[in-house]
Amino acid sequence: MSNPSRPKKRVYPTAQYVAPSSPSMPFQGGAFSGQTMQSQVSGSASPYMAPSGQFTQPMNASDAQNQPQFMTPAQQQLKQQISQATTSMNDMHLHNVPVIDPNAYYQPNNGNNIQPTGENKPSLTPGRPTNNLYPVDILTELPPKINDLNLLPPPILLEPEISTKFSESVYASPDYIRSTLNAVPQSNALLKKSKLPFALIIKPFKHLHDMNAPLPCNEDEFVIRCRRCRGYLNPFVKILQVESKWRCNFCGCINGFPDGSEHFQLPNLYNRNELTYSSMDFLPSSSYSQQVKEEPPAVYTFVIDVSINTIKNGYLFSVANALVNSLDLIPNHDNKTLISLICADSSLHYFSVPLDTEDGPKESSMFDISDLDEPFLPTSNSLLVSLSQCRNNLEHLLLKIPEIFKSTTIQSFALGPALQNASELVKDKGGKVIVCSSTLPNMGIGKLNPRDERGISNTSKESKDLLSCQDAFYRSFTVECNKLQITIDLFIASGNYMDIATLSNLSKYTGGQTHFYPQFLGSVAADFTKFSKEFSRHLSMDLSFRTVMRPRCSIGLRIEDSYGHLFNRSTDLCSFPAMPRDQSYVVELSIEDKLTADYCYAQIAFLYSTGTGKRKIRVLTLALPTTTILHNVFASADQLAIATYFARIATEKVMKNSFDHARSFLNTSLEEILINYRKEIVVENNAGGVTLRFSTNLKMLPLLVHMLLKNIAFRKGVIPSDLRAIALNNMESLPLKYLIKNAYPTVYSLHDIPDEAGLPDENGVIVMPPPMNDTISSFEKYGLYLINTPNELILWVGGNAIPELVSDVFGLQDVFQVPNGKNELPELPESEFNQRLRSIIENIRANDDEQITYQTLYIVRGNSQNEPANSSQNKEIVPLRNWAVSFLVEDNVVGCESYREFLQNLKTRLNK
């Protein structure tokens, strides 16, 4: 007997909710009546085409507890990899696959290595655990199995003897650090033979707020480091018990422990965090960092454009309103955070904010400075004020600023002088400068001119003429900012040309970020909501001030370069005046000498100041096995990390060379890997025709490269340079999880979601429907689909959707009543299906406290034979449909070949 309380799977045409004949929430002017959201159909201006794709939470080995012995995360990952590979081989009708016990990999000297199927098999060193290589013909797996994008990387196989206290905590979490290669060639020749890149993907902080999942922290002020290489004590050092010393795993130097401390006497020594956790924090003594005598407070300086453009598009009001609502969210743990406001048009406007009193708000004094040639502060008092002591008066001032400038006719914006004066104001303290603008800087130092894109876009000159830095000020000023410990963030909202390519240099080289809102209108509720939520999330994010990043590696390895929004002081030292929580970095490695040991190591250390003024150290240590066998290198390669590395290098190629160089790099890199795999690994058997064979753990790499080539950052076509520039900006800063989402959007079929989808599980987490392939061929004309991109959510309503579906979702009777463009789903309490869809959308927008992005929802109705011929929406909806299907990246869209065509052409090139 069925349980009546269990929700039924949605099967149409049976309706769950019947709209009244006169809908209680009718659409008026394209918007839901009674809601603040306004619909904006994208007709004359295309929506912002942000990067796309998704990387969901990785699967866990659910039956780990049933294993006969303890399984580390690496063992669980290995079990998962084997299960996936076995499934792939079953699909390929391979036979005689041995039964595998993952625990056998961790039994010393068992010699139990799995025989690869169908490839060359060299003799392996007995006793050394290895990932085994499983072949797959990519052409037989079409459409691609996109769930493979959710898999963890091949496990890092470590023997217990490697660690002083072996446990699962010695494995570096891929949330913080992961390598493109989880088995490192022992020689540079072997690395070159593989054609695989060797790099680390670093995300120093997992969440926007440090209170979420903090790392273990040592608070006893002991920071133990190697006296030769300065590496930090970690789980992989060798403890010399007789001498109470330790051998550094990076350089081999023997070091002592502090004398007279019981913390470093046996058995207490083995309980220390340094020997237990590969990722951890330290609170050093005040004398540890001698460069900083007294940590200054956190400082936030806002430079706000008050020219006529910000009045017309409602951005000034939006900024003031969002800042008022965020005053209590700005980190102010020690009540020392300082705030300053500078407004700019053709002059600079300073505000002296008085202290709060019990008598109510007091008026602030405004000082107007028209001399833009030299930095000049009108007064030394009350320009930089305490957030705690002036909070009410700051709110009062912010609410008045739109009124003060509402009648302006000034079209100028002196950004350069405003930045110079802001740096002068905070030169002794550093901090963040946040610029909010709708106008191209057109006055004073840093003046920019519109660039003529006609005849240049989509040519060999595009990168040099449209995406280069137009004025040297935007590079030279960042050098000064790094000296003064100032980070610059940009929030740009405009329908006009803004030269994002030039302005983004300010954030790129100071550790900040550029946020762009094209076609912004504050009167459109979706635009207002998106900016307000992202601005508030950005301001509430914890920060690490005065940060330096120092990567280290074993003897024989070399740090080549670092990529991301950072300032490179040297190849192995990067600085960030204020390190955010929502970016990642790539550190490229090389092999300069033969690696003779069984393992090599990398360590990334961050020295920074917290928001409370304390110095802190975060250390991430990664141990990797070495190998002399090319099979092991391929079998242990991380396809998602490789794709992230490719994206960073391709971005560099665009900026330093051209788009053709970037596209050639992506294509050639993939081809060389496949050629060498075929040459060195594959046993050719062409009886059944030419195949495109690859290792199972790398089979999604061609898809990812193809998606990068189709991304707005790299694809061919005439693309507005500001959209191109912001896409490149995101490519060089997005964390791996969101960069994969950038390349391959997640698509959900909603009209047939499982019973549990949209409802909380036993832990209160909303269950998501299974993803489907990004292809229009999977879309039913009567269906309902959600396309999840990094910046937007697109709800695709099939043009032949039946009335029951339309009623359940929108409370309407006819699919042609559904609005198109920016909107929100109405809340229909009587429709359980509507509530489940709203929960799915809210869950996606939460971003797991990892990104500030709030995705705008677009509703797009598919075409139908019953569509009214003379509908006024027809001309407006066609470009919206074309934009939506451009995210279905497996198809032949935006003038690019489909994934199937890409593979066929790739095979043809490889066989020449």
Curated annotation (Swiss-Prot):
Region annotation Zinc finger-like: where it falls in the sequence: 226-251
Compositional bias (Polar residues): 33-45, 53-74, 106-129
Gene Ontology biological process: COPII-coated vesicle cargo loading; intracellular protein transport
Residues reported to bind Zn(2+): 226, 229, 248, 251
InterPro entries according to UniProt: ADF-H/Gelsolin-like_dom_sf (IPR029006), Gelsolin-like_dom (IPR007123), Gelsolin-like_dom_sf (IPR036180), Sec23/24_helical_dom (IPR006900), Sec23/24_helical_dom_sf (IPR036175), Sec23/24_trunk_dom (IPR006896), Sec23_24_beta_S (IPR012990), SEC23_SEC24_subfamily (IPR050550)
Subunit relationships: The COPII coat is composed of at least 5 proteins: the SEC23/24 complex, the SEC13/31 complex, and the protein SAR1. Golgi apparatus membrane; Peripheral membrane protein; Cytoplasmic side.
Name assigned to this protein: Protein transport protein SEC24-2
Species assigned in the record: Naumovozyma castellii
Taxonomic lineage from the root: Eukaryota, Fungi, Dikarya, Ascomycota, Saccharomycotina
